[in-house]
Amino acid sequence: MRTYFGAASVAAAMLIGAIGAGAQTAPQPAVVYDAGGKFDKSFNEAAYNGIERFRKETGGTYLEFEVNNDAQREQAFRRMAQRGASPIIGIGFAQAPAIRKVAAEFPKVNFTIIDSVIDLPNVQSVVFKEHEGSFLVGALAVMSSKTGKVGFVGGMDVPLIRRFQCGYEQGAKHVDAKAEVIANMTGTTPAAWNDPTRGAELAKGQFARGVDVVFAAAGGTGLGVYQAAKDGKRLAIGVDSNQNHLHPGTMLTSMLKRVDTAVYAAARTAREGKWVPGTTSLGLAEGGIDWALDEHNARIISAQMKERLETIKADIIAGRIKVHDYMSNSACRS
């Protein structure tokens, strides 16, 4: 059994339609990963899976670079542009300053950035409505909690991660107004994305306060959270990629952020001469955000929980449930 609500094929069709329409030639694409490496089992790895899907389906090739520090970002994009790559796909909001500068220097090269918006004629921006998916998993967390206390571990303390936290809190309160959400951020530097030891420490601290379900939006740091949940016989929620398989039976679900499909769509539409600049925002309705149900968590998701969560999802898509976006006013209304 392997079921993803918002199946990959459907999401791909919707995202390709949203991201590409127009006509132009397309040289070899390139991907510049964010800190944490392409095999972080989360955000970067989703991007890697997307470009690998492009390679396998089209027979095309691509260039790639893994950023280890901020000083490498601008150099990486400039090098890719000099090599004639296009589109050059930057993974993560931290790539924005480098792309903004290099894209201005190479106006005939196309760039795609994931998780940020750059207003330049040769840049395509793809952002996600993370608050919608976080609302869903927050609701599921409280449905599954026996204590009424659920946790959140964020990576780097930035507005994007506050958006995750805020959506999660709203979903939890939607199910139970008395639910308590205990939240921690890992740090204030990019190192916060790749510190599983600290992630485990934060999770254990929350468990000691009564938390029995924890959601990590923290890149590689989340791996420590998930291990701590397994060791402590609690439940954890993955992020970005489907991480249910990491610890079957204690991974309640994963909030899917279809970075893989966005990267695939950018490369594929460029190859087909349909890449266009501009901003695309992807949420539940567009198939860019969802939750994961598969053979690894099916036993801990009851039919009633699934039905209720799908109803909440439909209500968000229809506008019957309004999910406040932290980034609209830098505040959370849960």
Residue ranges and their predicted role:
Residues 1-4:
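Positively charged n-region of N-terminal signal peptides that target proteins for export
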Residues 7-18:
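Bacterial N-terminal signal peptides
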Residues 23-334:
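A residue-level marker of the well-folded mature domains of exported/periplasmic proteins
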